[in-house]
Amino acid sequence: MARVKRGVVARARHKKILKQAKGYYGARSRVYRVAFQAVIKAGQYAYRDRRQRKRQFRQLWIARINAAARQNGISYSKFINGLKKASVEIDRKILADIAVFDKLAFTALVEKAKAALA
């Protein structure tokens, strides 16, 4: 049976990992064994954080809506409840944008929510 020389394949695999680790600090970008672990861990963090990003943005939107709603004399939960009763179907992302960039429109939404609750 002929001998299999895998130097080309190994070199390509190592180059691929070291390319992915470019920009990492110290040995993490130069030593294959360390770089491999760093790339694997980076992938795990990226996977986890893609899911966490969605939660974090929702938290941010809710915090912004709550702050704007309280400036208009209503709590977040009552505001959302009022919008549901008034059958206003605007998601939290858009509500947060309105709260930040268009105060008058947000005040109108608050009045609509208050009217639906009364």
Swiss-Prot record:
Q: Recorded GO terms, molecular function?
A: rRNA binding; structural constituent of ribosome
Q: Name one GO cellular component term.
A: ribonucleoprotein complex
Q: Which domain of life is it from?
A: Bacteria
Q: Which CDD domains match?
A: Ribosomal_L20 (cd07026)
Could you list this entry's UniProt keywords, alphabetically sorted: Ribonucleoprotein, Ribosomal protein, RNA-binding, rRNA-binding
* Keyword Ribonucleoprotein annotated: yes
GO terms of biological process kind: ribosomal large subunit assembly; translation
Which HAMAP family is this protein grouped with?
Answer: Ribosomal_bL20
Question: Function, please?
Answer: Binds directly to 23S ribosomal RNA and is necessary for the in vitro assembly process of the 50S ribosomal subunit. It is not involved in the protein synthesizing functions of that subunit.
Q: Which family does it belong to?
A: Belongs to the bacterial ribosomal protein bL20 family.
- This protein's name: Large ribosomal subunit protein bL20
What organism is recorded for this protein?
Enterobacter sp. (strain 638)
Q: Which gene encodes it?
A: rplT
